[in-house]
Amino acid sequence: PAERQLAILRELTALIMSGGRFSDAVYLASEGILQGVGFARVVVALLAPNRHQLVGKYGLGAGGETLRKAFVLTLESGGKDPVDTLVNTAQPQRLTASRGRLAGIVGKGPAAMAPIMGNGRVIGLVYAERDGGAAAIDDEAFFAFVHFVQQMSMALVTASRAGGAAAP
């Protein structure tokens, strides 16, 4: 998996440096999360312009598209839900058994979330989960996941600076 992660990161860096499209970066980074880090599903969700709703835009992996369609959440300012906490703090998280509002949408396997940042603020998140009974998310896997999400953020900033045409 480490070799696969590195190969995808190289390809992703080349894409970002060439001003590639954000959607291409999402697919490459998601491939890294799925194949290189060992998650089963990935959802990339972006905040609506009013910043009160989080909407799934990309879903990859086994059941990822179904999960994406269900991934529509209204944010609560000051809420203690894992999603609200991530948006308010911009800190990646490993999710425990308590999934908050995600419980009715996502699976029960080990999961993590990390923010997609743009211009110093959270503009979305990446949710990734493993199948139930899969290995817990150790530090190495968690930091690799976060690194791929950071690459997505860089791709978004680069695409936006290129005139917005390449942004989501």
Positions of PLM-derived features:
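Signal-transmission linkers at sensory-effector interfaces
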Residues: 1-23, 158, 162-168
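Amphipathic alpha-helical regulatory segments at dimerization interfaces
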Residues: 11, 15, 27-36, 85, ...
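Short beta-strand-to-loop transition segments that serve as allosteric relay/switch motifs
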Residues: 125-136
